[in-house]
Amino acid sequence: MHYRSQRRSVLFTAPGLIVGALAIGAAGGISVSPGDILALVEKPHLLVAVLFVGAFTGIMVEQALSRMRRQDGARGTARAGRNSARRRMPS
């Protein structure tokens, strides 16, 4: 189970990198084109900032989805437990 969750974090981080690049571009008041993203390689401090924001965003999305799945699972087992107890009761 841990192996799959680690694979998911990589999948969620990749779109986060793009979101981070767009957020930094929007905050700076510039429009972001693919050429601007490639130009970040020449500015390593900006590249590190974009990677950090993207990774952080991806991790937060993954944790939120995991929390939602856990809550839905707990509600499902609680409902099944209540319903099964009602079915067993003689009427």
UniProtKB/Swiss-Prot annotation:
Region (Disordered): 68-91
Gene Ontology cellular-component terms listed: plasma membrane
Residue stretches spanning the membrane: 10-30, 46-66
Protein name: Uncharacterized protein y4bH
Keywords: Cell membrane, Membrane, Plasmid, Transmembrane, Transmembrane helix
Organism: Sinorhizobium fredii (strain NBRC 101917 / NGR234)
Compartments reported by the entry: Cell membrane
Membrane topology classification: Multi-pass membrane protein
